[in-house]
Amino acid sequence: LLTSAGDKRSYYYHVPENYYGSWNYIPKDLVIACWWYDMREKSLAHFSGLGYRTIGASYYDGDDLENIKGWLETLGKTPGASGIIYTTWLAKYDLLPGFGDLVAKAERPKL
């Protein structure tokens, strides 16, 4: 688990310290998957600004595709963003065709 500079938590669950600066130890050839929807703009900008390629890890277990639309909009404006992955905790696949359609039509960022 990495955190971006915009995440000011002083701890993470049972970890006695924070993760601030953890990105300084990650090789630049790794792709960072940002999954926290509310922090997507800050996280993507942070890791992109450090030279990492990024992808969005959208939450798909909702009842509509609004979450995905927000991710695609932000990814389209993020240099170094190279895609989006489908993540589900509930094995919910009924919106998968619509997800694919949105991704196929999305604006592509410059790599």
Regions inferred by a protein language model and the residue ranges of each:
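Substrate-binding groove of N-acetylhexosamine-processing glycoside hydrolases
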Residues: 1-111
